[in-house]
Amino acid sequence: MKSIKNTWKLFALDWKRIFKNPVATFLIVALMIIPSLYAWFNIKALWDPYANTSQLPIAVYSADKPASFQDKTINIGDEVLKNLKKNHQLGWKFVDSKAELDKGVKSGKYYAGIYLPKDFSKDLLSFTTGDIKKPQIVYSINEKINAIAPKITSKGASSLQSQISEEFINTASSTLLKTFNTIGYDIDKNMVSIQKVKSAILSTNDNLGTIDKYTQQVVDLHGKMPEIKEKLAKANEFITYLPEVDSLGQKVISLNDKMPEIDKSLSLVLTLQEKIPEIQNAGKQISMIDEDFASVESTMTQGIQEAKDGLQIINQVQKSMPDIQKLGQDADSLGTVTLDAAKKMQSALPSITNSVQITLQSIQEFSKNTSSVLAVIDQAIADNQLTDEEKEQINSLITNFINNIARQREAIQNIVDYMKQVQESNGSHDLDSTIEQLSNLDSLLSGLSTRMNHLNELVQNGDVSEIRAYLSQINDVVTKISNLVDNIDVSGISKTIDTVLTSLTKTIADAKGLLNQAQQIDFEALLNSTSQTVSNAVTILEKYQGEMPAIKQEIHDANLMLNGNMTTIVNAINEGASLYKNEFPILKTKLGTASDFFKNDYAGVRKDLTDTLTMANEKMPDVESALNQANSLIQNDWPEIKSGIQKAATAIQKGEKEVDLGEIVKLLKLDATKESDFWTQPVEVQENQVYPIANNGSASTPFYTALCLWVGAVLLSSLATTEVHLSDKDKKRYSKREQFFARMGSFVAIGLAQALIVTLGNYFGLGVDVRDPFYSVLFALLISIAFMIMVYVLVALFGNVGKGIAIIILVLSISGGGGNYPIQVSGKFFQAINPYLPFTHAVNLLRESAGGIYWPNAWFAIIILVAVSIIFVAIGAILFPHFEDKTKKISEIGSKSHFFH
């Protein structure tokens, strides 16, 4: 642990000394960057050299003379020049003479020259005469100008040769095949009739069995002609029924048009089915009413009589009022008479209570009738329109309704006036809440009357949407009226009035207050309001009593009809619902289909039927005549014809076995263009780029990156010393091995910086195409560590000799590392040393990250580099303490020459 700690102290000491010295800092930064410049300049220079081959001048001159072929003048040289002018792969320079071409190539003005001799076209067409002579392209190249240029220009000449060869093969093969086409089409044209006859004979022979069946059917049909004529006559009779069918079709269409209305009406049976329990309950209620109707009549008669008795008492009191007023001066008489009137009023209280109850019940019934009126209006606007007749009916209904509201309000006002008079007579306020309820009820009825008037205006204007909205508002008012009537306590009102009258009687009986009280009571007003209230109740009851016999008979009839037929009604509703659910949809579908047929297809079918029968009637004589002739042919001539067909078919089949003219014609008629194209280029190359790299510069990056890392290590070892400068005291404190590892750490740190700078500069600065940038940086760091350790150990152990060894390894790596060219094209020596050079594996590792990593190869290179690093570290750690003094002595001997430092 102490050794490691000392090593870190020495490592830190190195960097403190560097950063304290500006010159040293500058040199270290320069050493980190300068090796990268070496790589970047080379990569950029080689970025895409083949993209600029159009700037490579190549002289072209054609001395070719035109040649004749089949009365056509052909000049291949001119065609070549035209094509080259369209070709921008090389810098073609079209000169005016052979001498200018040769001079330009010799002087280096042009890298190469291409010359087409004067007999080029003639020699190319020599195959047509049989005296074949291959044409020549004269290619001149100046190889001293550049090492790569001859290869590029040679490729251009080869491409030109291939192009001319392809054009020649294409033209020759196309001409030959077009001639074959002409021959093939001529044969085909002359064989059309033969093929048709041959096919007809063979087909007929193959189907003789079928033809025999048809001939027999013709004979049978001929025998059935009388029966066919009879059926045709019956079909003609059917035409006379078409008008009836037309009428039936119109009825079907009309019925189908009304189907939505029918469907809507029939759907009510489902509602009835849901209401069966209510219908059965209604039957029970009607039966109970029918049985108890006599009691109802008796109760109503009794109520009317009680009301009349009360009214009679009130009338008696009213008749006594003049006498009471005359006796107003006599206190005793006044008290007696007034007390008597009050008692009579109290005795009439049951009649008054019944009157109030009847009035409220009438209003409650009226609110229920309101819902019926609104339902009638809602039903009328169900189809979103109102007829004039419907408007008139609704107007009459609403007018009667508004008049009824007025009567109800009058009755309520009489009750309110009566209650106010009763309270004023006693000076109490016990009936205030009831009076307020009745006043609110009157206000609601007034609002309802106003709304019904406005509703009538909307109905007359025919605005259906506003009518619907307004009906909802009216329903809300009716609900409020019904709720308010339900909340009025009639029995409580009766008790309150009784209490008030009792109090009044007691007060009048008191002699002390008799005179004063009697004078304050307005019996006349009280009696008038009471009389009016009771009279209204009597009128309502007598109206209902007059209708009782008819109502009784209607209830009795309804009871007999409903309860006597309840089972039948329920069964009928259920059966109707089942029919609507199950049978009616089928009927509706079938009726719709029939309606569609009569609307869309019937006219065409009718026309086809009549036209067909008309045509059949017209053609029947011709058909009969043709059948007679066919029957005669079959009976007399068909056996001989059949025998001739069989003989001809046998002869044709025999000839087809020996010669297949169809295949010959097919070969001669092949597409000349496609076939000549195939002969010109029978094979196509499909290129598959396994690890694509965008350009030449990116492909060269692994080589120059590895090279710059080795150069950086050598450059650092040349400028920096491997010896740690320490005082004599510190030399005793730190061992040589600790000094060795500390300085190696400093070298490696600088090497890592060099690796980061060059790889990041490649990617972000130059835009090098790298498939795996992260691994590219990681691999470069590993390579830098390995190279820096190797160079450091060599220099630390051997001094300047070690530097020389590092340079020798560098030279061998450039030639034997397989960086720019495949190692297989190098000499045997370089192929032999290639696997043992660390540079080889460094380049291979960087190539993996550039094009795409194949991990078996990558791991192999990583293992080699790690192993080399470990070996050199081990060698240095073992030998450095023993070699340092010897290395110093060798360096001192060299420095005595005053030439080496």
UniProtKB/Swiss-Prot annotation:
Membrane topology: Multi-pass membrane protein
PANTHER family linked: TRANSPORT PERMEASE PROTEIN (PTHR43077:SF10), TRANSPORT PERMEASE YVFS-RELATED (PTHR43077)
Tree of life domain: Bacteria
Task of the protein: Required for phage infection.
Protein name per Swiss-Prot or TrEMBL: Phage infection protein
Entry's localization field: Cell membrane
Ranges annotated as spanning the membrane: 23-43, 701-721, 747-767, 778-798, 805-825, 860-880
Gene that encodes the chain: pip
Lineage of the species this protein comes from: Bacteria, Bacillati, Bacillota, Bacilli, Lactobacillales
